[in-house]
């Protein structure tokens, strides 16, 4: 074989190889988006910027998805649904020579019922659901073959590549198609989404938005309720929360450019979490409760149970000190020399602050004004409440045989009780007389030193019963007498020091012992007589 023949065969093979390596252009709406090899290339058809793609999946009861696809030779090619992709990848050789094909839009949306448990908990607690990856995969598999709506005027095509041109000639045609492209259009459409506060949405309604196409066709977009995230700020503190909102469409044209605005307006019937809030708290003490208002701040806590995240918002009072009033009507105990009763009085506040181990405590004390409700009465400031009964201590000094005793009698404060005639009175319990308990030592004789320190406690209670001169006091209406039963015990005794002998007198109670012994002998003597009776 001649050398020339070998070179001729090699040249023919090289020419054939060069002919097979052909570049093609990928067109979207007759606009070139990529140049790839016909045999090995994949056309990345990019969806126009005016078309949105999104993927939001919370559960099978709440999702909002929009994606695109095309069909070439009975094979379906989708965008990346999970990542809200906007590129349809199609092998160039599959579409080459098939002409322009349309692509389709799929929009799937489902919202929670406004009165459902999940919707209410989300609004009140700001709950953020956690979705498992398997649930998302199963959901995508169930919707990836959903039939969509063809977008009018939007096509995908693979044609021969013409260097230096943004649009290429269709396959099998030598004539340029630039005159058919939309690059010479004088108008463009820009879509944007804006989330605003509810104050600018008062005039927006739930009507549908209508857009008119170039061919006179109209597209009606239904306005649905969606969940949006808004940010609220107060006192230099901001926080985000989710609320339902409705969409409102607005259109403006500037220098031939048409802009379509989509504004989501939060529904005003849902309350948002405030950085500070005035709340009402109830304070209780001694079986009495009262309400007061204090400023509180929100505290957020998050718990996770079985993969479900729950967020709680608790308002905590800024300070535990109640709102101090300049004057306040309080319940007090008024006493004279013989009786005590409950009444009301106007009091003024006194604030006291103490610090113990770094903890600051604020106290508010209300002190009654004036000397008493009637002449001769004073307010008791050391009343004691026990088992629902109020007692007021009263100290009395008693001097016997040169010794002075201080007795503390607890007077029972009784409330008004009805009489037989239907009238009411407030009996007061007298200060019981200080008497020595049986077996108690007598006070020391003259000249004794001060010795023991005990207290005398008198418990007295006014009760209806038989009246005797020894146990009655004046206190009823029209001079009526009130029966009083008293119980006295000695708990404190102060013996005054007198001049004379420095020795303390000791009482042996011999008389009491002798009387007790005599009674015992008489009882023993009567025992034998019982056998003869």
UniProtKB/Swiss-Prot annotation:
Topology term for the membrane: Lipid-anchor; GPI-anchor
Keyword Membrane assigned: yes
Changes after translation: The GPI-anchor is attached to the protein in the endoplasmic reticulum and serves to target the protein to the cell surface. There, the glucosamine-inositol phospholipid moiety is cleaved off and the GPI-modified mannoprotein is covalently attached via its lipidless GPI glycan remnant to the 1,6-beta-glucan of the outer cell wall layer. Cleaved by SAP9 and SAP10, which leads to its release from the cell wall.
Residue stretches of biased makeup (Low complexity): 163-214, 427-451
Effect of deleting the gene: Leads to increased adhesion and biofilm formation.
Keywords from the UniProt entry: Cell adhesion, Cell wall, Glycoprotein, GPI-anchor, Lipoprotein, Membrane, Secreted, Signal
Stretches for region Disordered: 161-219, 418-451
Pfam family, one: Flocculin_t3
Keyword Lipid biosynthesis appears in the UniProt entry: no
Compartment(s) of residence: Secreted; Secreted, Cell wall; Membrane
Signal peptide residue numbers: 1-21
Lipid-substituted positions (GPI-anchor amidated glycine): 511
Listed GO biological process terms: adhesion of symbiont to host; cell adhesion; single-species biofilm formation; single-species biofilm formation on inanimate substrate
Role description: Cell wall protein which plays an anti-adhesive role and promotes dispersal of yeast forms, which allows the organism to seek new sites for colonization.
Protein name in UniProt: Yeast-form wall Protein 1
Organism: Candida albicans (strain SC5314 / ATCC MYA-2876) (Yeast)
This protein's encoding gene: YWP1
């Amino acid at each position: 074989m001649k050398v020339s023949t070998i070179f001729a065969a090699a040249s023919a093979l090289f020419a054939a190889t060069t002919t097979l390596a052909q570049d093609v252009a990928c067109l979207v709406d007759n606009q070139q988006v990529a140049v790839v090899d016909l045999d090995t290339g994949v056309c990345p058809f990019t969806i126009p910027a005016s078309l949105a793609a999104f993927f939001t999946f919370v559960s099978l009861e709440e999702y909002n998805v929009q994606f695109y696809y095309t069909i070439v030779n009975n094979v379906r090619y989708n965008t990346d649904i999970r990542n809200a992709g906007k590129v349809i990848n199609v092998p160039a050789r599959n579409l080459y020579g098939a002409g322009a094909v349309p692509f389709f839009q799929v929009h799937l949306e489902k919202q929670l019922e406004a009165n459902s448990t999940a919707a209410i908990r989300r609004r009140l607690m700001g709950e953020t659901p956690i979705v498992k990856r398997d649930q998302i995969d199963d959901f995508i598999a169930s919707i990836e073959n959903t039939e969509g709506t063809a977008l009018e005027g939007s096509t995908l095509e693979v044609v021969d590549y013409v260097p230096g041109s943004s649009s290429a000639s269709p396959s099998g045609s030598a004539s340029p198609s630039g005159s058919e492209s939309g690059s010479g259009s004088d108008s463009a459409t820009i879509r944007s989404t804006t989330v605003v506060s509810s104050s600018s949405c008062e005039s927006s309604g739930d009507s549908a938005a209508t857009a008119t196409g170039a061919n006179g066709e109209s597209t009606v977009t239904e306005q649905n309720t969606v969940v949006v995230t808004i940010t609220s700020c107060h006192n230099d503190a901001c926080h985000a929360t989710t609320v339902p909102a409705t969409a409102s469409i607005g259109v403006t044209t500037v220098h031939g450019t048409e802009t379509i605005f989509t504004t989501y307006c939060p529904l005003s019937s849902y309350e948002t979490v405030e950085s500070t809030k005035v709340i009402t708290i109830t304070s209780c003490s001694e079986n009495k409760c009262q309400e007061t208002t204090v400023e509180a701040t929100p505290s957020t806590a998050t718990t996770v149970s079985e993969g479900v995240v729950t967020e709680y918002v608790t308002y905590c009072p800024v300070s535990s000190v109640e709102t101090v009033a300049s004057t306040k009507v309080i319940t007090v105990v008024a006493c004279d020399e013989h009786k005590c009763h409950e009444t009301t009085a106007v009091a003024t506040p006194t604030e006291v602050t103490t610090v113990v181990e770094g903890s600051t405590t604020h106290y508010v004390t209300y002190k009654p004004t004036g000397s008493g409700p009637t002449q001769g009465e004073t307010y008791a400031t050391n009343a004691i409440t026990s088992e629902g009964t109020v007692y007021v201590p009263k100290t009395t000094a008693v001097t016997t045989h040169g010794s002075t005793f201080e007795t503390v009698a607890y007077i029972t404060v009784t409330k008004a009780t009805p009489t037989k005639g239907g009238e009411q009175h407030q009996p007061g319990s007298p200060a019981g007389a200080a008497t020595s308990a049986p077996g108690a030592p007598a006070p020391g004789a003259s000249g004794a030193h001060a010795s023991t320190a005990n207290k005398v406690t008198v418990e007295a209670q006014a009760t209806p019963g038989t009246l005797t001169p020894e146990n009655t006091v004046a206190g009823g209406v029209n001079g009526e007498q009130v029966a009083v039963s008293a119980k006295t015990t000695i708990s404190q005794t102060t013996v005054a020091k007198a001049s004379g002998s420095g020795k303390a007198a000791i009482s042996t109670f011999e008389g009491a012992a002798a009387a007790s012994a005599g009674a015992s002998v008489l009882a023993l003597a009567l025992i034998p007589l019982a056998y003869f009776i």
